[in-house]
């Protein structure tokens, strides 16, 4: 099985399954000298971990990360960093009834067709449980970018089902289980999720993620454009079915005179492009948005087939998130951090001696 590594200079390779003994990853390319401990990575893992509210899966995992290599006396050594999280609360018996059945909307069928065999326990490798290691690896990238470049990466829930959330209060995001930037809307979100749970149904969501303080110049045209690689990384998150950079599909209805990001000596006059032009960062906020589909694991009966091609009915009885978007915010932040870290190292390696005749334009004139 290939396709488990992302990055060129800062690389992340993950391994493990939902109901296996552990999940792990290897982070290679991190520069030496970064102060790093498990505590630095644990904060975001706690933000992502399951079982923290009635609105997410009730699987209880501490998601305690162990650093196995690449750190000595509290500093990164420049060698591969090995990370491990042990699974603690698997309940594989919940999946015995679907051992020979394909859950509609899941990767069961496609994994079976590709490999001729699959780990049916919680989805195996296709489970979002794998994203715990992305968050751990992303924690390294976030720390480096923050301490060396002053880059801050934050995400938030922008929409849950039909409920659109605006405006954004950055100080409120981590004060509720939804990562909702408007505390006044939290009771509405709770009522919506309670009703869904009673129905046995699920909901989709939209998550926005913003990187502030990114220097201009990151991105490698033409195939490794920064926006292309961000879209690639964000689309790799489980359940993501759409990615927008900046105004995204809103550009279809916009006129060029409005959409273009005009400039002045005082700064940019707009950011429709989401901080990226020609595949290269402008120095403005990098803004991305992901759309996550409704969870397919439902208590409601669904039609499907078994491994013999016979018609069957499937009811999922395991512990699942009724909306995967609720816990997706730290995952999206991690994937953006990994891409930005990789592109910073690539840019530094090729262009650190470039003499610029122009100081960067301020991100905003306002």
Curated annotation (Swiss-Prot):
Name the UniProt record assigns to this protein: Chorismate synthase
Binding partners and assembly: Homotetramer.
UniProt keyword list: Amino-acid biosynthesis, Aromatic amino acid biosynthesis, FAD, Flavoprotein, FMN, Lyase, NADP
Matching Pfam families: Chorismate_synt
Cofactor(s), names only, from the UniProt record: FMNH2
Pathway: Metabolic intermediate biosynthesis; chorismate biosynthesis; chorismate from D-erythrose 4-phosphate and phosphoenolpyruvate: step 7/7
Classification via InterPro entries: Chorismate_synth, Chorismate_synth_AroC_sf, Chorismate_synthase_CS
Tagged with keyword Flavoprotein: yes
Entry's Gene Ontology cellular component terms: cytosol
Keyword Iron assigned: no
Superkingdom of the source species: Bacteria
Single Gene Ontology BP annotation: amino acid biosynthetic process
Family classification: Belongs to the chorismate synthase family.
EC number: 4.2.3.5
PANTHER family: CHORISMATE SYNTHASE
Record SUPFAM superfamilies: Chorismate synthase, AroC
Organism whose genome encodes this protein: Methylococcus capsulatus (strain ATCC 33009 / NCIMB 11132 / Bath)
Coiled coil: none
């Amino acid at each position: 099985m290939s396709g488990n590594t992302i990055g060129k200079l800062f690389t992340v390779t993950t391994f493990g399954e939902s109901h296996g003994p552990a999940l792990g990853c290897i982070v290679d390319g991190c520069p030496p000298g970064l102060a790093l401990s498990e505590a630095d990575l644990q904060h975001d893992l706690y933000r992502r971990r399951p079982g923290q509210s009635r609105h997410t899966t009730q699987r209880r995992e501490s998601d305690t990360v162990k650093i196995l290599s690449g750190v000595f006396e509290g500093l990164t050594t420049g060698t591969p960093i090995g990370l491990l999280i042990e699974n603690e609360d698997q309940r594989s018996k919940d999946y015995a009834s679907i051992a020979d059945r394909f859950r509609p909307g899941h990767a069961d069928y496609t994994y079976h067709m590709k490999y001729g065999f699959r780990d049916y326990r919680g989805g195996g490798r296709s489970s979002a449980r794998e994203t715990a290691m992305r968050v751990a690896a992303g924690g390294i990238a976030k720390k480096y970018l923050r301490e060396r470049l002053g880059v801050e990466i934050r995400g938030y829930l922008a929409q849950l089902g039909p409920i659109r959330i605006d405006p954004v209060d950055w100080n409120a995001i981590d004060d509720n289980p939804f990562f909702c930037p408007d505390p006044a809307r939290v009771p509405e979100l709770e009522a919506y999720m309670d009703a869904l749970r009673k129905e046995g149904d699920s909901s989709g969501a939209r998550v926005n993620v913003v990187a502030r303080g990114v220097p201009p110049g990151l991105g490698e045209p033409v195939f490794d454009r920064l926006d292309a690689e961000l879209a690639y990384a964000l689309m790799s998150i489980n359940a993501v079915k759409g990615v927008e950079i900046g105004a995204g599909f809103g550009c279809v209805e916009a006129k060029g005179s409005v959409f273009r990001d005009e400039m002045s000596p005082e700064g940019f006059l707009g950011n429709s492009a989401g901080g990226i032009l020609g595949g290269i960062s402008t120095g403005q906020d990098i803004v991305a948005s992901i759309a996550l589909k409704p969870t397919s694991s439902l208590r409601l009966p669904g039609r499907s087939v078994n491994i013999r091609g016979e018609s069957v009915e499937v009811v999922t009885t395991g512990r699942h998130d009724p909306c995967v978007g609720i816990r997706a915010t730290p995952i999206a932040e991690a994937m953006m951090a990994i891409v930005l870290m990789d592109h910073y190292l690539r840019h530094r390696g090729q262009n650190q001696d470039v003499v610029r005749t122009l100081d960067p334009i301020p991100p905003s004139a306002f």
